[in-house]
């Protein structure tokens, strides 16, 4: 059972322009606390920032909320498994909101696909439910 799908397409140069202008302020707006802590371990290129931004946008679209109901970029952490597959960690508040939308006897599943080609990043998120 599918709750919703979300997709976001972003031109990397737009993110670079904003990041060049606002730097750390921009990072603090779109990155979770965990992502900010780990940024010293990874190189935050415009491409990576665009992937964070697009995936979080796609997730809230799939959730059906957008960035409302007190949901912000900081409530969503993008991570990768050892094999590179992306996944999301949600703040307690967003997790509770997702579980409220989950039918009894089901568990929420978040599927993510991120791709980039030259000047663009695209992220697709499908929020669905699986019977327990």
Can you name each region flagged by the protein language model?
Residues 1-132:
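Core catalytic alpha/beta fold that binds nucleotide/phospho-ligands
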